[in-house]
Amino acid sequence: MVASRLAAGGLLLLALLALALDGKPAPPQPLRKAPAGGTTAWRRELTEQPEGASRPAAGGGGGGGRSGSKAANAAPTAPKSKGGAAAAAAAAARLMRDLRPDSKQARAAWGRMVHPEHHAGGGGGGGGGGGASRRLKGVAKKGLGKGCFGLKLDRIGSMSGLGC
């Protein structure tokens, strides 16, 4: 009953949408051709700036530090000298690297989104993880080794579901 009313409402909305458009399809958009130079041409296209962007940004904070967000750091600045062109190319390369969907960081972020319960683990250095990922020393290390079946107690209950 509810499904039929929902379907009828959807059809009514589609009919009203068709009347609002007067049956005219949208004009076709011309296809944009890819540059012949591949990724090099894309980088060149990214470094080209419109006329309005050639002025320096307000605030004067143009240092080379990495304290801002990635989007602020990736924005190409106007070249001031011959070295400025290299800086603009580096900014464009950084933008391309950040937008790449198959990078290591993107895969790690996707894994954390899909499996949030496994994020507390964590491997080597570089932070992240939480308190469970630090190595135990001294007495705590000796007590941890003799668990169920000679395996670590924290692994048995959490991952396999065996428990002791």
From Swiss-Prot:
Q: Where is the composition biased (Low complexity)?
A: 68-93
What pairs make up the disulfide bonds?
148-164
Molecular functions per Gene Ontology: hormone activity; toxin activity
- Propeptide cleavage-removed residue intervals: 24-142
Give the primary localization class: secreted
Localization, per the record, is: Secreted
Highest taxon listed in the record's lineage? Eukaryota
The record's listing under PROSITE patterns reads: NATRIURETIC_PEPTIDE
UniProt entry keywords in alphabetical sequence: Cleavage on pair of basic residues, Disulfide bond, Hypotensive agent, Secreted, Signal, Toxin, Vasoactive, Vasodilator
Give the residue range of the signal peptide. Answer: 1-23
Q: Which Pfam families match?
A: ANP
- UniProt feature, compositional bias: Gly residues: 58-67, 121-132
Q: To which protein family does this belong?
A: Belongs to the natriuretic peptide family.
Q: What is this protein called?
A: C-type natriuretic peptide
**Species per Swiss-Prot/TrEMBL record:** Philodryas olfersii
Traced from the root, the source organism's taxonomic lineage reads: Eukaryota, Metazoa, Chordata, Craniata, Vertebrata
